[in-house]
């Protein structure tokens, strides 16, 4: 009888271990929606052709030590076109391009590698995986069948290099589930005691929502370190961005005849 009880106990523990293991690798699908705001530019006719928001389908692939956040297989690129009143200036902002946005997090080494592109040039931004100062509350909801807990923190966005602007603060609200016991989440939002399924930034100006959780897919080939682009630090990338945007502004202000630009927001 004792032997039978021992076998039953071993069987229960084994099943529990298998179930727990199954919760530490898989894929979470998300939708991202960002409300768009444009500063008025004299002579540039934004009119009704500008969308009120931009959306994207994303996927988070993960195991116990790694997470990769990138475009979902069904993601469709969007282009935004702007034209001056006299037709002498045209600009196209493209969400697609030669370099896909990929955020690779090494959870064990606490390192991050972000592959992105701007104006046709590719970059690999290397940084430490910094832990946000989350405040975990007692508030709970059920989402996609998971019990989720609310966490909040204030995100500080530094000013553009060389500008007189002040830092901008944005409140971030996240809902994470301890039922998926990994510090993962969409985009930069993670480092909580469970996977983040919902994110709201700046009172809903950006919203990220999980649409499905899949523990059955083989995600081995997705957990690959991105390699495209020039390796830069976050500060170096911000400096490059500032210089390129200044160049665009000068070209627009000093334009002669017809000018056009294509900006790839990869």
Segments the model singles out, each with a brief description of its role:
Residues 23-266:
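Extended soluble regions of mature proteins
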Residues 1-28:
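Bacterial Sec-dependent N-terminal signal peptides
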